[in-house]
């Protein structure tokens, strides 16, 4: 009798364990009661990187509103939910759980890289498709469900080196980077690898969170360089430029990547007060006067005003929403409002990894004012989530009074 009772108890325990195991494997469809298709995102809406997060939220919402005004997806409205992570990876676990359990079916991932490296693991475990506008780390798209609208760090570093090889031959090159930031180090490493040997060894100067209050030492180390590569964000870049004014060569060029977008709008920094030139590798020109990008800019300013942050992060988010929407249409699948995140992920992967071509506002525009964007190479092979489009070099400020 005791043996039979023990066997029964063991069977119940094993049964409950199996139920628990299956429940934790993504079987729950938190979207089963959805009446809209929910897009989730996490980004800095407050703090030092808020200029990026706000632009992403505004632009994604603009795209959602435009799509909904035209009938949504087969009559189903889209809904955007974006949470503040303050550019802190420690906030991602809570944000992701809130988004996923709140019915998120597809995602824009995160705005910045460090939080994105945390986000990708959760999204992979639940098979949630995400297309990030601006988390550039190479490993963001490590798993098969992650994609980037922005150029990955390796691509930014390599493309920037091509600009230097073509435009700055014979110049003395310096590099100012953040040694405790994956974004900065990743771009720097790939830039150095692709830089022509004729430049010799670049002059290196770095900083960390603990040393970000003053760059007098770094300015001194780089003051004789002709071109200073800055794979960093705009706040520390602006501080370096302010402290380097009158010390760094007057006709030097500061050259960055997407993190420098917004450098001309940093509080308490007048970019025209320095003599040096400022340029960065980009996939969007916020001052363009024509094409689809201009249409987006006009709509953005009409909705949010002239003082709202406007940058390539936001433009990429606008493209992200439309790319997801167009891919859903292109799939021909019977997508309902309560489709599970996993099922929608499989549908979208089938598009992005094959012959799906998106015409967007980021990347070098073609004759019709739009750019060609894919996630495959020239031979049609999947690029493991990395975007394929033509970058542009954008000049914020020319050298003056040198």
Predicted regions and their residues:
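Cys/His-rich metal-coordination motifs, chiefly Zn-binding "fingers/knuckles"
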Residues: 1
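Extracytosolic ligand-binding ectodomains
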Residues: 21, 25-402
